Design a protein with these regions (language model features):
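Amphipathic terminal alpha-helices
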Residues: 69, 74-77, 83-106, 111, ...
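N-terminal Rossmann NAD(P)H-binding glycine-rich loop of SDR-like oxidoreductase domains
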Residues: 111-131
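NAD(P)H-binding glycine-rich loop region in Rossmannoid oxidoreductase-like domains
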Residues: 161-200
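Conserved Rossmann-fold NAD(P)-dependent oxidoreductase catalytic core, especially the SDR/UDP-sugar
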Residues: 175, 181, 199, 206-248
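Flexible, glycine-rich beta-alpha linker
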Residues: 228-229, 244-247, 272-291
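Active-site Tyr-X1-5-Lys
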Residues: 246-272
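Glycine/proline-rich active-site loop of Rossmann-fold NAD(P)-dependent oxidoreductases
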Residues: 254, 267, 279-295, 310, ...
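C-terminal substrate-binding subdomain of Rossmann-fold SDR/epimerase-dehydratase oxidoreductases
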Residues: 310-313, 317-427
Length: 427
């Protein structure tokens, strides 16, 4: 290299040869003393403090520090910040910081962690993903002890999302690449315990976001029809519109959507989110949500032949069978990044009222007795939610298409609950 080459080029050449020739302490919190002929000068926590500009060592060191922060060794320019700076969280990183991270190619075998795994969706999602990635590559976690069949079905560990250190240890020790964050208190339960809902749904989310950003994970956080409020368009509700929910559950989900989008733009976090409608699943008990009447009716119809609904018979809400929900979740996670025009999508399959659902069930179990005892809290929540979702962006961007409509849903649910004898008698 010519002796007249600029310092930046000379530094790059020397670093490429493995002999930078000096010690950098630019990122150290300690203070460094630089001794020159003009006397001692102090250098604080970051390069750029006032130091005698005529000192050649300082000028070269500052250029190297800038080059190291902006240009990773692999030669590509880093534009995102997926990791913490010396143990600090993304919330504490300087605004002008840039880092380079290792990303996982689509061909790599994913290592998956599911938080809140013993809720309505976690067990089914684990089973679904294990068929795709292998039994040992999908780890279910929760703070509760799992039933024996869940424990024996694949890896299960204790995980408290409010314990950041525990969460970080799990991600590191198990080489996690995808994280599905299902820990949350649902709508009606959250209203009964706002402080706990705030801790789980918001503080827990912050921990998950930080861990995912630090380790370059692909993160999925479900949202909900509850993220909308009474001032939102209800029929249909588009992806982008005013969102003013009136439950702590809804507020926390809007917060999750916006924080995930912020981390995507600010730190490069691969955040993906679906707004679920009411999800109907056969193999789980109702979890305290406003739409859980649509699950409870099948349990009660088969067990007792009677069902008391806590919503008005004409309350229309968007719904989806769990198989469609799980498939949509995997499809959006596997979608190429360039195909996604937004970070949060509506998805939908059907929309019905309690009366319409009961009428369809009566086709199979004519002796079913349905009564209505309206819960004013749940009814107020339902009246503030969408009646129909506009999911045209999901269908256009990554090819979403549902399989189950109301007749298929009812038949599948009743068959699962062992109602074949009742169906045969009715026929």
């Amino acid at each position: 290299m010519a002796t007249g080459a600029r310092p930046r080029e000379r530094i790059k050449a020397r670093c490429a040869q493995g002999r930078p020739g000096f010690l950098l302490c630019a990122l150290s919190p300690c203070r460094v003393r630089l001794q020159g002929r003009s006397g001692a000068a102090s250098l604080g926590g970051c390069l750029g403090r006032r130091v005698t500009e005529s000192m050649p060592v300082f000028r070269v060191s500052r250029q190297v520090a800038c080059w190291m922060l902006q240009s990773p060794a692999c030669g590509c320019r880093a534009s995102v910040l997926p990791s913490r700076l010396l143990g600090t969280s993304p919330r504490q990183i300087p605004m002008d910081a840039n880092f380079h991270s290792t990303s996982f190619s689509e061909a790599d075998q994913q290592r998956v962690l599911i938080t809140g795994g013993l809720g309505q969706l976690g067990v089914g999602l684990a089973s679904f993903l294990r068929k795709r990635f292998g039994k040992d590559n999908v780890i279910l976690s929760d703070i509760r002890k799992p039933p024996e069949h869940v424990f024996l079905s694949g890896p299960f560990i204790y995980s408290d999302i409010l314990d950041y250190k525990n969460l970080r240890e799990i991600v590191v020790n198990n080489r996690i690449t995808w994280l599905f964050h299902y820990s949350a208190l649902l709508s009606a339960v959250g209203e009964a315990n706002v402080s706990l809902a705030r801790a789980v749904n918001i503080t827990g989310l912050h921990n998950v976001l930080d861990v995912a950003a630090e380790h370059g994970l692909r993160l999925f956080v479900p949202s909900t029809i509850g993220a909308f409020g009474p001032t939102s368009p209800r029929n249909p509700t588009p992806d982008l519109c005013i969102q003013r929910p009136r439950t702590i559950y809804g507020v926390s989900k809007v917060h999750a959507e916006l924080m995930g989008e912020y981390y995507y733009y600010r730190y490069g976090l691969d955040f993906r989110c679906l707004r679920y409608p009411g999800i109907i699943s056969a193999d789980s008990q109702p979890g305290g949500g406003t739409t859980d009447y649509a699950v409870q009716i099948f349990h009660e119809a088969v067990k007792n032949g009677r069902f008391e609904c806590n919503l008005k018979p004409d309350t229309r809400l968007p719904m989806m069978y769990i198989d469609d929900c799980l498939r949509a979740t995997l499809e959006v996670m596997e979608a190429p990044a360039e195909s996604l025009s937004m970070r949060t999508y509506n998805i939908s399959a059907m929309s019905f009222t309690p009366a319409e659902l009961a009428q369809e069930v009566l086709k199979h179990i004519p002796e079913l007795q349905v009564t209505y005892n309206v819960d004013p809290v749940r009814q107020a929540i339902a009246d503030s939610w969408p009646m129909n979702f506009d999911d045209s962006n999901a269908r256009k961007d990554w090819g979403w298409k549902h399989d189950f409509d109301l007749p298929e849903l009812v038949t599948t649910m009743l068959n699962f609950h062992g109602s074949e004898s009742r169906v045969a008698q009715a026929n």
